[in-house]
Amino acid sequence: MRVKVGAIIYRMRYETIHNLHIPKIGYGCWQIGGQRSADPADDDKSMAALRSALELGYTHFDTAEGYAAGHSEELVGRAVREAGISRETVFITTKVSPEHLKYDDVLRCCENSLRRLAMEYIDLYLIHWPMIGMNLAETFKALNRLVREGKVRHLGVSNFKLRLLQQAVKLSETPLLTDQVSYSIPDRTYAKNGVLEYCQQNDILLTAYSPVKRRFVRGNKTLQAAAQAHGVTTQQIALAWLAMQPRVITIPMSFNPQHQADNLQAAELILSDTEIAMFG
């Protein structure tokens, strides 16, 4: 797919998995509509950011019932409707919160998310965080039902370490699509604990949230040198490092249209083996 940013046309890179084409760079919706609670005073700012992202060519939007107490979902759905685009052209991820993992709660929360999004189905539904003492089999019984009923098309998890991820794979009646975790150049926790390798070996996407640690990218001389060599920003190098890895996608967030465009363009960058090795 070609994406036009300003006067330049870029070719977006995708991960192809289970007959899906998922963009390497998606749009994270944390802070859209507020943070832990809804902040309608910021709706104009949030809607402007979503409109800009859609106009730039973003198609994957990642939200959650826990983002702004569900208001983020409402604004994402509104932005898609107001853009006048086909529902099939966007890929919507949302998440059920860890306090809602009992069977009936999962079903109820999915219905609430669908209502807030004003959509007939969710493309990807994640367990947002594992909960101590949760009955994962009970949770997946509900999730599998949602897939069978057509309310959810794909299932995934978030913040699952290897043992729990393996359990989730066994419990899901359909191929588990992703484990969404914190992953970046300075944060290799899920590479060190085996999750990244397991995902790459088992056709599961690792979705990297918090992909850019701003304090790190601004002060890292190796990143600065690579950015200068490519004529881009250090943030774009950090995103390109993720986008080049097989079975890895990422979901940076920005309200700033220029930064949104820069993030999208990062998927075009090709880093050399030498540059990648320099990042450790």
Residue ranges and their predicted role:
Residues 9, 130-280:
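Beta/alpha (TIM)-barrel catalytic core signal, keyed to glycine-rich beta->alpha loops juxtaposed to Asp/Glu
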Residues 39-53, 102-117, 138, 165-166, ...:
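Short, acidic/polar
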Residues 20-25, 57-60, 85-90, 119-123, ...:
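Short, well-ordered coil/turn segments that N-cap beta-strands
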Residues 106-126, 145-149, 171:
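CE4/NodB-like, metal-dependent polysaccharide N-deacetylase domain
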Residues 31-37, 99-101, 217-218, 259-262:
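A short acidic, helix-capping loop that chelates divalent metal ions and anchors anionic groups
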